[in-house]
């Protein structure tokens, strides 16, 4: 567990993320997905149940809003990332500097024609060269992988396919307007393997309010042996079929605490299967949450929350396995992880003290001169034998 804590901390927290998130503006490759908000008035009007424009706005006004919502220029993100990279590199000059291992391309790049896809990939590949990143991971819908050749993507720098499964449970897929099933997903996984590319998975958590059903999705994910796991929250946007269901009372959303508890179980299950590259994205349509949000849990610091919970579980088990009752203990660790160990407002330590009837838990910074303590995530629990008043 200690090793997995170190790895998830490096992958999810310390490491900066280069994420290029293309908005999804069409149902192409996503069938008739209930959670999609589509930037295509003509296409939308041909799909049953989607022709009503909200708030009685005129078509011209609606198109104007949609257009502004979906504007995305990859060069803007590249410029921002380059500036961040150069500034941080300058600050850490002379040190062992490493920014990230991978670039993530998420969302709707696959909805463009091939020429546009390759043009966008060329820009990102050039950026990757400048910042010294060798791995580029591209998210693709299941139907895209099944219907198109993906081998050519390797020529454009893509080494990993993030398969946008949405879910791995047939019932969840069916209820959300997707025509493919788990059988088709396994075919897509096999096709990626035949292309000699790494395979990762992205999925939306919370499409079902049945926790057992959600956890079965993760069990199936483990069987597919993904390199990475991209987890998105089920955020309901205005103008979607799920929005109609929610308004009518036919869609139940998980509470904040239910979401956190389920995510904790999902992360724990993933770590046990040695899936340590876990990326959290707010929504499949993250670009337009601000303007079109209706309901759903949105976290600004879910990575930190999950790592904090992982440390609590580790410390809890560590003390339990010591089989020594003591009212005072000392936790030695690098100062950089003190916050994760303590939890928000010392919540982790307070719970430990209450459960084990302790009076005091001291936090001591690990001696950096100790060669065995080079890892920034080193953690040691010491039983204090001295008597205290």
Model-found features: residue ranges?
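Auxiliary Fe-S-binding modules of radical SAM enzymes
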Residues: 1-20, 34, 92, 97-99, ...
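N-terminal [4Fe-4S]-dependent radical SAM core
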Residues: 1-99, 104, 130-132
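Core AdoMet radical
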Residues: 44, 65-81, 85-88, 97-114, ...
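Canonical radical SAM enzyme core domain
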Residues: 72-77, 115-119, 125-152, 205-216
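Short, electropositive alpha-helical surface patch
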Residues: 121-123, 211-227, 285-304
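Alpha-helix-loop-beta-strand connector modules within alpha/beta enzyme cores
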Residues: 121-130, 184-200, 258-269
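Acidic (Asp/Glu)-rich catalytic clusters
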Residues: 152-157, 194
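Conserved strand-turn element in the central/C-terminal portion of the radical SAM core barrel
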Residues: 188-213, 217, 232-238, 246-256, ...
